[in-house]
């Protein structure tokens, strides 16, 4: 053994210790308690964000941030260059991917409701710091490009209204700048720069001001959409959907178009970033996400149908498709009506992209992963004004230089990756064991936590109190607290949920305790999917569950099952990436029905199915939330698959630009963020504190134990809880350069230590406080 120890290379040991330290840093998670403690509290700079947003405000933000650019720009771009009339199918595929990701977002929104930062915050709580930074950094890219794209689209629309007079004047007066992404005859788009700056000022003025402005523009946009539907109906021509015309680019073009159309749905994550400013995030966030996605899908499909039935797909104008389609049919007055809607829709879309960007930067800077001056909140506007100005300036600069199509494609890849990681987080979190803190109460907002704790506390007094001495036990306790407390709570349905009524039943003889007799049925009594399945297959339902090895109600996740799910999810992500890559880049071999290609596809499908089935066999965490993603693990797994596929359908140059952005982010994280994060500073302070102070028991004055409290400033030592005999310990400050040389001696009896301590007290030689 001694030979083995002496053979160890000290440098190898040092590298191992360094790797372990780095590994622990990148995987550390932010405690949820720190999020909830900050609920409604002031920020580090002394100002809190205003909680003024209603559910309708959130829906308006989500719809507005999507519909503008999606309806007035993306529909024409995808229809002409990628999918033809099949753009309708592209929008539906993109909507399915968005809805799958949206339900995962909604669950995260109610887990940590009072937050800014969206998927960044959720990942920091559940997965780890490095993944959280990576997601947050790409969300910044998403909003940065979205803002620039909105400004560029508005500039193109104004130029189209002016018969391209603005662009010609720019080229003649300012000149062209080749190689900056706007084509061979590119010019600095000063109008887009001015538009981005104006919207930045609007957002920096305050949440309520910007949301009110957003709502007005949405109403105007809705009116124009109704006009397009009614007026366009009189000009439709079915021959443009004739045989061979609906999918001119084939299914490959439809799927490529779906990847770009995904850009038109990404606005729903703005809802998740406003949790700290929403009045009731637990119910508002999931409802607003679902409603905004459905509204957007309806708008896109209807507009795409009118567009592709009014003009041939190859003649669609990519800059202002909805205005020019009426011009092509001779209805010139409609151009100006649609122009009003275009201004309203694109402006609110621009606002929707710029609104969440400073809040993600604010959240990351507050955690120390970005420069902390970016977390400054104005006491006048109650907004992160520094982050607003910096992000708005960068977006304005980008709109000045880069083309609209390049912006849209680059934006989609970062968003798809963020949504994929959100789905991964849902899978991981739902199958992990319970923490020391009650997960139900832990993840609810403060107001719901108080109500939940109040219910259980009242019931504990009357149901769970022990039998007094001399009192006869008269059988099971009967609840008297539930009848007077539960009906008075308006949010009781949401807090406890219908599935918990059998467990916390006011008429149940053991109210307030877990019902151990109902088995699987109690857990699934309100699960509509399982009810339909049981009706379909009848009594064989429970036999099938046992044969498939599915967990029962009383099964609880353990560290081992949680680790199994983590490994399965990691393998699932890698296998899906390989599978989608082969489907896309090896499509020729598959279409030729090469035996090895078919065999490889079947093998990967079987492996993916097996991993999902292994996850299905693991017990879920029993904690209930106001909203939970349905059909686990199938919904998050399918969302991962669709998002990865759409990512790989984007162009190579988009991946190269994305890689450059990620490289810059890694430089910032490993050069600044990892060493200045709030968790790192707290860990250093704790380590310094532990190395400076030692605790010594009076019974064993030379033993070292952890955990003691300081005297508050101005508090006398006599008020520390009584004499030393009652306290049982004293503190001594240790010097880092003079380590403690006294060691504990078990040979000495406790009575000897007691005598020594009493002698010290008598001579006033015992010091109770750090020097």
Curated annotation (Swiss-Prot):
The way it spans or sits in the membrane comes to: Multi-pass membrane protein
Membrane-spanning parts:
58-78, 83-103, 130-150, 187-207, 216-236, 251-271, 291-311, 336-356, 360-380, 384-404, 407-427, 565-585, 596-616, 628-648, 655-675
Q: Which residues are glycosylated?
A: 282, 676
The Gene Ontology CC terms held by the record are: cytosol; lysosomal membrane; nucleoplasm; plasma membrane
Mark out the compositionally biased spans (Polar residues).
732-743
Keywords recorded for this protein, A-Z: Amino-acid transport, Glycoprotein, Lysosome, Membrane, Phosphoprotein, Transmembrane, Transmembrane helix, Transport
Question: Residues bearing Phosphoserine?
Answer: 465, 468, 488, 757, 769
Stated role: Imports 4-aminobutanoate (GABA) into lysosomes. May act as a GABA sensor that regulates mTORC2-dependent INS signaling and gluconeogenesis. The transport mechanism and substrate selectivity remain to be elucidated.
Please give one Gene Ontology molecular function term for this protein.
gamma-aminobutyric acid transmembrane transporter activity
What name goes with this protein? Solute carrier family 7 member 14
Instruction: Kindly state which reaction or reactions the protein catalyses.
Output: 4-aminobutanoate(in) = 4-aminobutanoate(out)
Stretches the record annotates as Disordered: 712-771
The source organism is Bos taurus (Bovine)
Kindly list the places in or outside the cell where this protein is found, as annotated in its UniProt entry. Lysosome membrane
Q: Which InterPro entries does the record match to this protein? A: AA/rel_permease1, CAT_C
**Is Transmembrane helix one of the keywords UniProt gives this record?**
yes
What spans are recorded as compositionally biased (Basic residues)?
745-754
One of the GO BP terms on file: gamma-aminobutyric acid import
The UniProt similarity line reads: Belongs to the amino acid-polyamine-organocation (APC) superfamily. Cationic amino acid transporter (CAT) (TC 2.A.3.3) family.
